[in-house]
């Protein structure tokens, strides 16, 4: 994916050039016209879109116009459950909840425990499935009710997916998936077949509703290869093409392009206690100067600062965020003070999230699609 950065569904490395990535994938930048169309139907625009976290799409305008015609559609995203959830994972889910609330549509959420088992030589299947149930608590904690959220744990809920997946698999050649995902002769056949399952969920609402029901998929840009293939074969299977809305990666606390589960200090996890959260924030990389004197004299650079990045995520007030930006640039705001302000915001969010998360424990099966379909 270029000499300076790599972006695949399984690996993100280097400083990501998002415009270059857009050209390579062939997705479209999100325009002011499309944002205005969203505002027309939703009544407002979520800060994650206004502030550029979601920046690209495939046929986002189509799904909005489809909605305007009063036709049915659904939302779809997922999670590869290989460990605990951090804030970066939750960004598409937060927008997913907003869309569901604004438009009253159902959500299909895939937990790909099979994929993580196939991909990680050390991962036991029971471990991946266990993480699927744990991660589901974080999704439910965002406020979804079982009438709107349909969880699909691949190894537990395969029945409604499999007939679609085999039709999808028949349309995908080895050469196609090899070129798309970079599979090699040493790739196990589970991983090679897996894209059929992720694609299948994009077509599942049409099967369940017995009428064309396209999906909107808010997800990180690294998932685009799956949905390019889904769009390529949709017509041949008589399904509507899935539409997508792509986010950038959430900057790591270390200043790198993306949080990494392999470096716990690069991310804030939903189950981090408050002491750990504060420690991570206070030790985060910043766009500030080496000394307070230099900061006051020259100001900082919020554009490269993960602390400011997090303020944009957790402060809904545009004026407040802009004041932080300007005070940083002018030198009126020092990094230590800025970090403490951020800790207050994140601490409040996580305290409430953890409480809702624990209330969801033992209720995951109420949300599972195959349980509802029995």
From Swiss-Prot:
Q: Which SUPFAM superfamilies match?
A: Nucleotidylyl transferase (SSF52374)
Biological-process GO terms, alphabetical: tryptophanyl-tRNA aminoacylation
Q: Which UniProt keywords apply?
A: Aminoacyl-tRNA synthetase, ATP-binding, Cytoplasm, Ligase, Nucleotide-binding, Protein biosynthesis
One Gene Ontology cellular component: cytoplasm
Gene3D superfamilies documented for this protein: HUPs, Tyrosyl-Transfer RNA Synthetase
Q: Which InterPro entries match?
A: aa-tRNA-synth_I_CS, aa-tRNA-synth_Ic, Rossmann-like_a/b/a_fold, Trp-tRNA-ligase, Tryptophan-tRNA-ligase_arc
Catalysed conversion reaction: tRNA(Trp) + L-tryptophan + ATP = L-tryptophyl-tRNA(Trp) + AMP + diphosphate + H(+)
Pfam families in the record: tRNA-synt_1b
**Which first-to-last residue range defines the signal peptide?**
none
Q: Does the keyword Protein biosynthesis apply?
A: yes
**Renumbered ranges of motif 'KMSKS' region:** 258-262
- Places the protein is found: Cytoplasm
One MF annotation (Gene Ontology) recorded for this entry: ATP binding
Motif 'HIGH' region, residue range(s) on this chain: 81-89
Enzyme Commission identifier(s): 6.1.1.2
Q: Which PANTHER family match?
A: TRYPTOPHAN--TRNA LIGASE, CYTOPLASMIC, TRYPTOPHANYL-TRNA SYNTHETASE
Known HAMAP family for this protein? Trp_tRNA_synth_A
Q: Which family does it belong to?
A: Belongs to the class-I aminoacyl-tRNA synthetase family.
* Name of protein: Tryptophan--tRNA ligase
UniProt source species: Pyrobaculum arsenaticum (strain DSM 13514 / JCM 11321 / PZ6)
**Taxonomic lineage from the root:** Archaea, Thermoproteota, Thermoprotei, Thermoproteales, Thermoproteaceae
